[in-house]
Regions:
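Alpha-helix termini
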Residues: 39-40, 62-64, 214, 232, ...
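A polyampholytic, Gly/Pro-enriched intrinsically disordered region
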Residues: 99, 202, 229-233
């Protein structure tokens, strides 16, 4: 664990702004959340590494986004339990990351229906536990997470009812019960998130979404295809590099 943070007293001395902790993976959804948090509150950012395939690249995106947004208070956490538990293509090298066909090619290329093998079992609960714990120490009132239900991969921990239930846990399990987990993007389609991010000046060029590559995004995993489709539907150019084979998707 690496902590670069002001003390609670220094945090609370900031004039007139409430505090928020944002979970920042380095992807485009969490980046837009970080922009919203930094705009509306004094923001601190948490990044959790859990043995995922693109761990180093995601951490680099986290640091770069924080630098661009001026977020100084950062917490880097390594969760070894999720990798040890396995059960996901993101954490288990023996499970292949599925490749999705090109945009607009019909059913064979569609994003899979149901919970895919890239789902990391109960991952967001681990992330939220860290963020809420830190928010309680800092005296922050909100925890931002970039969960999205429409146009997502069908992950069960990205549903509104999950966050309603989690907020009840936070209310019952923290000293003052005043921390709220907020999900400003949860009802938005991916292309709407791209449009919002562009309006807010979100640094999409610093983000990373690919599940399996760290130098050039593969363009064919579930996450890449959802991202490419979102930029296409928003009428915008995705600023990150893709492998040559993925150029046909753009």
């Amino acid at each position: 664990m690496v902590l670069n943070s002001a003390s609670k007293s220094a945090w609370n001395s900031t004039s007139g702004r409430s505090g928020a902790v944002v979970l920042l993976s380095g992807g485009m959804d969490s980046c837009v959340c970080a922009v919203l948090a930094a705009r509306d509150d004094r923001a601190a950012a948490v990044h959790v590494s859990y043995g995922q395939r693109t761990e180093a690249r995601e951490r680099r995106s986290f640091e770069s986004i924080c630098d661009r947004l001026g977020i100084r208070d950062r917490l880097l956490v390594r969760n070894e339990a999720l990798q040890a538990i396995g059960g996901s293509a993101l954490t288990d090298a023996s499970i292949a990351v599925p490749e999705v066909g090109a945009i607009g090619t019909g059913a064979p290329g569609a994003v899979p229906v149901g919970v895919p093998v890239t789902y990391v079992p109960f991952r967001n609960a681990h992330f939220l536990a860290v963020a809420v714990s830190w928010a309680e120490v800092l005296g922050a009132e909100k925890v931002y997470i970039g969960a999205v239900e429409p146009d997502s991969s069908g992950y069960p921990d990205c549903r509104p009812e999950y966050y309603r239930a989690f907020n009840e846990v936070v209310k019952a399990g923290t000293k003052e019960g005043a921390i709220r987990v907020v999900t400003p993007l949860i009802a938005m389609h991916k292309h709407e998130i791209v449009t919002l991010g562009l309006e807010l000046g979100a640094p999409f060029d610093l983000t990373w979404s690919c599940y399996q590559c760290e130098e050039r995004a593969c363009g064919v995993c579930d996450s890449c295809v959802l991202r490419l489709r979102a930029f296409h539907e928003a009428g915008a150019e995705d600023p990150i590099p893709y492998a040559a084979a993925a150029a046909r998707l753009r």
